[in-house]
Amino acid sequence: MDYLVTIGLEIHAQILTRSKMFCGCSADYADAPPNTHVCPVCMGLPGALPTPNRRAIELAALTGLALNCRISHTNVISRKNYFYADLPSGYQRSQYDDPLCVDGWVEIEGDSGPKRIRLTRVHIEEDTGKLIHTNDGGSLVDFNRAGVPLMEIVSKPDISSPEEARRYFQKLRQILVWIGVNSGDMESGALRCDANVSVRPAGQQEYGAKVEIKNINSFRFVERALAYEIERQIRALKAGEPIVQSTRGWDEVSGTTVAQRTKEFAEDYRYFPEPDIPPLHLTDAWIDERRAELPELPDARRIRFIEEYGLTAYDAGVLTDERTVSDYYEQAVAAARTRGVMPKEVANWLTGEFFRLLKETGESPAHAAQRMRPEYIGEVQELLNNGVITRTSAKEAFEAAFREGRSPAVIVAERGLAVIGAGDALTDLVRQVIAGNPKVVEEYRRGKATAIKYLIGQVMKATRGQANPQAVQQALEQELAREQAAC
């Protein structure tokens, strides 16, 4: 029997603000000593009154616009009531009936081609504290994270496979980091995912029971957790066992999902409007201001790179994966064009040597770009195009410029990387190679045309790649002919 899989994701993304969602405490909790970025509001003390963070709301609205959502003019903050040790007030300020952003969609590469994943909502809420488990079986609570601004991005159940879920999660992360609303750091918990999945026999119209997998913090784990859970549910259905709506956790060590609790329903949280925060009313003018903040998004820029710069779809995709790289490429193209260097030539350096050196050094593109000025790329290519240096020397000059942050032209001059052209120096090297390889020379004279390639390689090796290969071949042929005539 065939089975249909239905998946929806809830992405929890911390909003990049200096202060928390409803108080003035610092939202930068990563390296702070436990419970030092706290106050009566985020500790949930009686009588403490919250104040919404304007910038957090602006960035959440910006996110909604980037995800093709409609921004609600009236927003209500609600209390989501439940008890857990990391929730000091006994409720979480969130949104229920009146979220900030509704509808929307994200386009991904689906299993059968381009596919739109529809969104239900994007709403704002506050993060919880963090439990720290000790070796003796106890648990401690750090409330520095409590109250940090958070967005929940909820998709409709449009995802059909674990692979699509991974691509959707990756696409969302790309957009959030691109527009500057989230760090994209999943290891620290700044971006995490809850996955809802149900399985039903093919032909059955009614969805199967929904199982939620909580707090997944990597693309690989999303795919693996869903693949396991789908297989678990199919095995249960084949055995005639019911699937119970529940919450499970992903155990990365065993590669399995683990039962945590029976799944709650919305009614269990007893949502009601936050009495200390009146409804937020957003005007059309305010929404237009947020729309004006929106940068060119990755998909639009990728298409423009193909059409304007003549890049392949692959190169355009690579160069729009991160905004830092994409902006750097455009700066490099603008500088290179003044030297007659083509955008494709700039792209080749970035997707080749630049990325190789980033991987080798472990640097971020933003850090490397501060040293490797964008105009250096066109400078290297111009020297290569004008025959001043060979491809080998160009790579050496590029790497030196990357590591040292100095002009490639200066490096070429200092290291003597300029091409060794026709002349006495090249002739002397050619004669040395001919004298040192009598067997190869004899093969060449017997008609083995490929033998000269070996001789060319030896000359290039002796010049450290600085000679022009065409000039080397011409010098070799002339010298071999001269020696032949002298015999």
Curated annotation (Swiss-Prot):
InterPro entries (UniProt xref): Asn/Gln-tRNA_amidoTrfase_suB/E (IPR017959), Asn/Gln-tRNA_Trfase_suB/E_cat (IPR006075), Asn/Gln_amidotransferase (IPR018027), Asn/Gln_tRNA_amidoTrase-B-like (IPR003789), GatB (IPR004413), GatB_C_1 (IPR042114), GatB_Yqey_C_2 (IPR023168), Gln-tRNA_amidoTrfase_suB_CS (IPR017958)
Keyword Ligase appears in the UniProt entry: yes
Chain segments annotated as transmembrane: none
Coiled-coil annotated residue ranges, if any: none
EC number: 6.3.5.-
UniProt KW keywords: ATP-binding, Ligase, Nucleotide-binding, Protein biosynthesis
Catalytic activity: L-glutamyl-tRNA(Gln) + L-glutamine + ATP + H2O = L-glutaminyl-tRNA(Gln) + L-glutamate + ADP + phosphate + H(+); L-aspartyl-tRNA(Asn) + L-glutamine + ATP + H2O = L-asparaginyl-tRNA(Asn) + L-glutamate + ADP + phosphate + 2 H(+)
GO biological process assignments: glutaminyl-tRNAGln biosynthesis via transamidation; translation
Molecular functions per Gene Ontology: asparaginyl-tRNA synthase (glutamine-hydrolyzing) activity; ATP binding; glutaminyl-tRNA synthase (glutamine-hydrolyzing) activity
Pfam family, one: GatB_Yqey
Annotated PANTHER family: GLUTAMYL-TRNA GLN AMIDOTRANSFERASE SUBUNIT B MITOCHONDRIAL AND PROKARYOTIC PET112-RELATED, GLUTAMYL-TRNA(GLN) AMIDOTRANSFERASE SUBUNIT B, MITOCHONDRIAL
Its biological purpose: Allows the formation of correctly charged Asn-tRNA(Asn) or Gln-tRNA(Gln) through the transamidation of misacylated Asp-tRNA(Asn) or Glu-tRNA(Gln) in organisms which lack either or both of asparaginyl-tRNA or glutaminyl-tRNA synthetases. The reaction takes place in the presence of glutamine and ATP through an activated phospho-Asp-tRNA(Asn) or phospho-Glu-tRNA(Gln).
Family assignment from sequence similarity: Belongs to the GatB/GatE family. GatB subfamily.
Record note on quaternary structure: Heterotrimer of A, B and C subunits.
Protein name: Aspartyl/glutamyl-tRNA(Asn/Gln) amidotransferase subunit B
Source organism of this protein record: Roseiflexus sp. (strain RS-1)
Lineage: Bacteria, Bacillati, Chloroflexota, Chloroflexia, Chloroflexales
